[in-house]
Amino acid sequence: STAGKVIKCKAAVLWETNKPFSIEEIEVAPPKAHEVRIKMVATGICRTDDHAATGNFVTPLPIVLGHEGAGIVESVGEGVTSVKPGDKVIPLFSPQCGKCRVCKHPESNLCIKNDLAAPRGTLLDGTCRFTCKGKSIHNFLSTSTYSQYTVVDEMAVAKIDEASPLEKVCLIGCGFTTGYGSAVQFAKVTPGSSCAVFGLGGVGLSVIIGCKTAGAARIIGVDTNKDKFAKAKELGATECINPLDYNKPIAEVLQEMTDGGVDFSFEVVGQLDTMMSALDSCHAACGVSVIIGVPPNAQNLSVNPMLLLGGRTWKGAIFGGYKSKDAVPKLVADFMAKKFPLEPLITHVLPFEKINEGFDLLRSGKSIRTVLTF
């Protein structure tokens, strides 16, 4: 048994930004009290990992990135009650302590114990569980899934159906849930409504799946890459438009298409100009616009208050507005019950050692989601 012992394993270490990941042998310490050590089985490559790898999302280095994954509990620290060795689990980049003001609030989900706002790169106790060549290696967003083994706090892991295929449901750890939940849980898209989705990558396509599930009548995909339109329509988009095909602002085009603007718009690009376009494209009196895309670095928007005074709602969500520990097991159960698909989002499956190839696919726009398997 490996319980209580240091485990030596492979991990993708980022020593410095804008350099390839280095596959290294690292040591993973046993879990302390209220911590869980997980043997990773599969992990997705998400744009947020790329933002960290390029330095646009500032995090301490060296680090083991990865935050969208699934695995099996190897051992648990003292006092852990929600999971046991052998359980299938998904680590949670947005934890749920259950005690803070946010966790107790019925409508909010960004637990104050998260490591998103100003990443320390540690577990809750302020220390790391990884070492390599004598150096301490930082954790990423409470998860660090680009390692054969990782250690997480108990509040940052959810037990899931033991029959679930981990190489698919790992997407529920971030990308799918972030998009799908933004439509069904956070914006609460209504039956018969009109929706516009800006950005048709993995998260944008997941928004489309959510809009369709919620019963939207019109789902308009917006992207400058028309190669993405076929997949968007396959998953529920009723039409797709390319802003480059018009000689006027895309918000005007959408307003004309939808009698003054859509009921719900979603920005899944992470650019200031598309955030403004998405806001302007929802109806001035009753529209709701949701920001999902993360801007690579902190920039300010300047907004005319008249855009909001008529009754528009403008809001943002992380992880689809879901309380993570509560929602993830239910979402996995819904997937197992065939309430939504994940397979169309996975375009590439690569062995973990080919992580740099996976990031090349992301950066070149050739993949929707690449899943790395261990």
Swiss-Prot record:
GO MF assignments: all-trans-retinol dehydrogenase (NAD+) activity; zinc ion binding
EC number from the UniProt entry: 1.1.1.1
Superkingdom, taxonomy of origin: Eukaryota
Single biological process term from Gene Ontology: retinol metabolic process
Record PTM N6-succinyllysine, positions in chain: K233, K339
Zinc found in the keyword field: yes
Residue numbers binding NAD(+): G199, L200, G201, G202, V203, G204, D223, K228, I292, G293, V294, R369
PANTHER family attached to this UniProt entry: ALCOHOL DEHYDROGENASE, ALCOHOL DEHYDROGENASE 1A
Protein name per its UniProtKB record: Alcohol dehydrogenase 1
Source organism of the structure: Mesocricetus auratus
Lineage of the organism: Eukaryota, Metazoa, Chordata, Craniata, Vertebrata
The encoding gene: ADH1
